[in-house]
Amino acid sequence: PDGSMKASSRVAPVAGETLERIDALLSRLGNPVGVSAYKPYHSSGEDFLHSFLGMIGIPIELTPQFREDAPVVFLNESARFDPTIVARIDKQLRAGKSIVITTGLLKALQGKGIEQIVDLEVSDRRVLTRSFSNLWGGVWEADRDILLPQVRYATNDSWEEITALAAEN
């Protein structure tokens, strides 16, 4: 009757007030930095992996452009849709920068030139485990079993940072 609007939801005004308070702090946070993650347009493979990494606290900057200026680029299986991805990986590494790839991408690039860059191969074997070690400082246990692909490599040419332990090894 007095012409004033009544909030139709108690959630929206509270959220608005909270966001206004946060706005006052944003200028003091600095420049957030995340790991550049390249996902070409219209690509798929290992879907939602970037989101899962973000949920465990790894800041991901997902982009459809391959960031040559990034010190580290994360690539999952979706990068296979870029026909120049092996050349991009090679160029990035030769520039002294780091590339992190998943076993999904490694398997997708087998026979397409990746073997000229790294002497690793994803086999068809899997291991179901919950035990892990860094080989130098103990064993850690996950809450549940995790199914992992086996990656073959020549010992002393490559070393894993973390190894999965099973009864067979």
Spell out what each predicted region is.
Residues 1, 32-37, 71-75, 95-100:
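Hydrophobic beta-strand segments of well-ordered beta-sheets in folded domains
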Residues 1-59, 163:
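Hydrophobic targeting/anchoring helices
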Residues 4, 68-70, 108-109:
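Short secondary-structure capping/turn micro-motifs that flank functional sites
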Residues 28-30, 66, 92:
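Generic structural signal for beta-strand residues in well-ordered domains
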